[in-house]
Amino acid sequence: MVMNILTKIFGSRNDRTLRRMRKNVDVINRLEPEMEKLSDEELQAKTLEFRVRLEKGESLENLLPEAFAVVRESSKRVFGMRHFDVQLIGGMVLNERCIAEMRTGEGKTLTATLPAYLNALTGRGVHVVTVNDYLAQRDAENNRPLFEFLGLSVGINLPGMPAPAKREAYAADITYGTNNEYGFDYLRDNMAFSPEERVQRKLYYALVDEVDSILIDEARTPLIISGPAEDSSELYISVNKIIPHLIRQEKEDSDTFHGEGHFSVDEKARQVNLTERGLVLVEELLVKEGIMEEGESLYSPTNIMLMHHVTAALRAHVLFTRDVDYIVKDGEVIIVDEHTGRTMQGRRWSDGLHQAVEAKEKVTIQNENQTLASITFQNYFRLYEKLAGMTGTADTEAFEFSSIYKLDTIVVPTNRPMIRKDLPDLVYMTEQEKIDAIIEDIKERSVKGQPILVGTISIEKSEVVSHALEKAGIKHNVLNAKFHAMEADIVAQAGQAGAVTIATNMAGRGTDIVLGGSWQAEVALLENPNDEQIAEIKAAWKVRHDAVLAAGGLHIIGTERHESRRIDNQLRGRSGRQGDAGSSRFYLSMEDALMRIFASDRVSNMMRKLGMKPGEAIEHPWVTKAIANAQRKVESRNFDIRKQLLEYDDVANDQRRAIYTQRNELLDVSDISETITSIREDVFKATIDSYIPPQSLEEMWDVEGLEQRLKNDFDLDMPVKAWLDKEPELHEETLRERIFQQALEVYHRKEEVVGSEVMRNFEKGVMLQTLDSLWKEHLAAMDYLRQGIHLRGYAQKDPKQEYKRESFSMFAAMLESLKYEVISTLSKVQVRMPEEIEALEQQRREEAERLARQQQLSHQEEDSLNTGSPAQADRKIGRNDPCPCGSGKKYKQCHGRLQK
């Protein structure tokens, strides 16, 4: 009550914002005569003047009135179109990091040119985001003449474009593209192996068209780049053949023991290790199978993956037993859960182990699609420094825009008053009665010459209506969002007298339905039309336009209510553009999904009490209110789901940003030798500590285990036991220092063979490749954790907190694994000639190219888990700042340890 009184006195927040902006509109209007006096050259020179003023420290807000006045005057000269005052307000809203709700037909595309120009003056790039490729191309080409007149470059970012073309598109002042492509390019840039492979600049300003569709409807849809693992089934089969030739020995080879076998097994760690004898035999057998060349070593850089295959095959034969660890059913290897004994359909072991077991069991070897990178739209768009959007329907979702994206919604008034008649809903008992009533309504209105747009919630429903219209002999067009270019043509002509068009809710968004049809489309069919022909077409169109207005304008028929009021409002918004006449009505039945689930009992009882007969409809404000309440319930539930998903996904997002920041830092430096030395020290300290605990008695030392570990994991022959026997004074610290120094000397000798430059490149390549590999495995592990985390609720634990805690532990473990695997790989690679390193780099490049060709870009509807304030991309993290991964530790004590 009090709030209502205050609102009446002071106006709503929306009213106050519009009042403030109208003052700026007055300033722009006063500048108009001054701009009209300028020559084209003087008007174009304003762009350079604005840029100079920005460099001198003037703010964009100060420049706004002049910049908008320049764009308006340029638009008059280039397009013959003048921005309305409400479009200037829309442009200001978009510049202020807000959502502008502008009704259909109010000229959102022209409005967007204002903030796009203003923000492009910074030289940091403006990304205009559309829902499909057709609209991106259309808007870019339509607005290109205006921007180029003003001295700005325009780029189009489309799927399938080569990297140089994409780089050029992103280098433009204003880039048009789809939400999918911007997101995928971000992910691909964070998989690049050199700075030159990246295409995007730092993310500055995103202007999102149909913002409700992208930031709300698709919020639960992660962008996923998955690479089908290379088809190496033949290799698995060939390697599998050599395993029966190998003999097991009980103990690992050491200084005091040399067995006759070819491999030993560590049951506890579930690992297998080849002996020297085994290595020689495996190499011989691989040469015999034609997998390896004569004289090659299994440990040479180019054969690292082959060694991986041999180890996987050995583990499959020795450590994994049929009907214990797995079963074979219908030609498929299915894992058995070791704790429950239940089969785990759909789960697969990673690292090629599952394929090795399939080769062992002689069943079809399946390739796996591995998730290499993923991000949700929610988290991608929060990376932009400035984010704004526009749509015809945002007010119903204003709370979600505010709470998740920190974006306020401002309803921009229409240029002319809206006079569309929104008729009350009609509710029927059955679906068939409803369809019959719709057909009758269409018959009556099309005879009068009124155009009709029938909106359905699915392609299936549109086919039902289409079939009924065919049966009634009514000519019509069907749209179902498959062919965007053709769709726009049909929508443009849907305003012809008596035209009947069926469309799914999203089809044709972005294209206005012009009453009387589009005269521009008719002109486009003529070759080199002259002014007289254009005038004739316009005159004929004016007659048709007036006739359609007289018939009542465009009539919208909704065949059922959508879960979201916003989608219903979008459908209604196709009619009544720019103050035109129009009408709308929704036809419902008790068999509709929404009515059946949420409103059935109350409305059914009401209909029964009224004694309704077949074919009769109920039309009452109570019914409309009951339906609106049902929709609010669904919207609230969907919002809660999206909010909860975002809370979970923010954990992964913090980790993603940490990894991508480190990855980009790695890419941008040529020498990471200091980092390698630092993590080598950490790795050797941790390794030695696990066998020689700090400040422990010698009786507690496992010297033999340490020697084996150094040999197996780092290819270092160090007689630690002999040193201790010969030098009794050798204590824990001096021993640790000696091992580290000897490891360093061995590494430096390798470096002398190939040269420091080649070694630096190799270190960087190994670091990037290992990081990518572990991140990929971490994504899969996070996914598995997320799928089962809700069960913690039964143990009276908060699943969100448990997920955060465990995922951080997994992240910390991944960083430790990264250090260990990088040092292990660099230590084990046997380098003889610089050419071998180059061969490995070439192999890596070929693998990256293969992946780029095979990349499957998939939109995967998933309850992926994701809120929070907008992430400020590229802020330098101080060493004493809180770690961005959410652990609560300082950066230097968490994943910043890699930056030592």
Curated annotation (Swiss-Prot):
Induction conditions: Repressed under conditions of excess protein secretion capacity and derepressed when protein secretion becomes limiting. This is regulated by SecM.
Skewed-composition ranges (Basic residues): 889-900
Binding of Zn(2+), residues: C883, C885, C894, H895
SMART domains: SecA_DEAD, SecA_PP_bind
PROSITE patterns xrefs: SECA (PS01312), SECA_MOTOR_DEAD (PS51196)
Keywords: ATP-binding, Cell inner membrane, Cell membrane, Cytoplasm, Membrane, Metal-binding, Nucleotide-binding, Protein transport, Translocase, Translocation, Transport, Zinc
Region Disordered: start-end pairs: 842-900
Pfam families: P-loop_SecA, SEC-C, SecA_DEAD, SecA_PP_bind, SecA_SW
UniProt binding sites for ATP: Q87, G105, E106, G107, K108, T109, D512
Subcellular compartments: Cell inner membrane; Cytoplasm
Catalyzed chemical reaction(s): ATP + H2O + cellular proteinSide 1 = ADP + phosphate + cellular proteinSide 2
Keyword ATP-binding: yes
Key word Membrane present: yes
Superkingdom of source: Bacteria
UniProt EC number: 7.4.2.8
Gene3D superfamilies on file: Helical scaffold and wing domains of SecA (1.10.3060.10), P-loop containing nucleotide triphosphate hydrolases (3.40.50.300), SecA, preprotein cross-linking domain (3.90.1440.10)
Composition bias type Basic and acidic residues, residue spans: 842-852
UniProt-listed InterPro entries: Helicase_ATP-bd, Helicase_C-like, P-loop_NTPase, SEC_C_motif, SecA, SecA_CS, SecA_DEAD, SecA_motor_DEAD
UniProt topology in membrane: Peripheral membrane protein
GO biological process: intracellular protein transmembrane transport; protein import; protein targeting; protein transport by the Sec complex
GO cellular component, one term: plasma membrane
Complex and partners: Monomer and homodimer. Part of the essential Sec protein translocation apparatus which comprises SecA, SecYEG and auxiliary proteins SecDF-YajC and YidC.
Role, per record: Part of the Sec protein translocase complex. Interacts with the SecYEG preprotein conducting channel. Has a central role in coupling the hydrolysis of ATP to the transfer of proteins into and across the cell membrane, serving both as a receptor for the preprotein-SecB complex and as an ATP-driven molecular motor driving the stepwise translocation of polypeptide chains across the membrane.
Protein's name in the database: Protein translocase subunit SecA
Organism: Pectobacterium carotovorum subsp. carotovorum (strain PC1)
Protein encoded by which gene: secA
